[in-house]
Amino acid sequence: DKGFFAEENLQVEPQWFDAAHPIAVATASSQVDVGATGITASLFNMAASGQKLAIVADKGREQKGYSSSALIVTADNYANGVTSLEALKGKRIGITQKGSTFHYMIGRMLETKGMKLDDVQLIPLGKLSAVMAALESKQIDAAILNEPNISKVQRAGYGKMVVQVGDLIPYQTSAVFYSPNFVKNEDVAVRFMKAYNKAVNYYYDAAIAKKDAKQLAE
């Protein structure tokens, strides 16, 4: 904690969720003030049904040349030649939930090779930790993971990277949202965003300078 939020006289209490959809629901219903999560199909469905929340800042995007999300296959599959999207045909692909950003990513990536989702077996596992566990135990053949999970899996030795998502389909994956109640409090909302921007700039500058690597990874 670098004290950026305290500098703006804000006390932040993180609440953790297992997947993107519950975060959007909690934010739209003002159970939490601020949400940071993927821009998913369920989010658009909520907006279409009249539920309100405000997208206020970038959280993450896929861009060529930058490590964000990637297709990871089990080490055994990689050793046996599953080193391309085309080689995924008939394979079991782990995702968190249907309609998630990972679901969208694999569909779009397959399209770049003239393939469809029907060419693979999608296995919804509910949460990212379950996807990683299934990859390690070889209950699935591949998955889309994001950082720092990509690095964790590769260091552990049970997964190999095939391709970065951003190298094939640049797009906005996630954002910061304000709840309907929180967005009405302009003073607090602005102060929160100032603190958030300070934190993002610290992270970016430290990463570029390769400082505080352990803390950034954690």
Per-range role (PLM):
Residues 1-116, 121-125, 141-147, 164, ...:
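Short, glycine-/small- and polar/acidic-enriched structural segments
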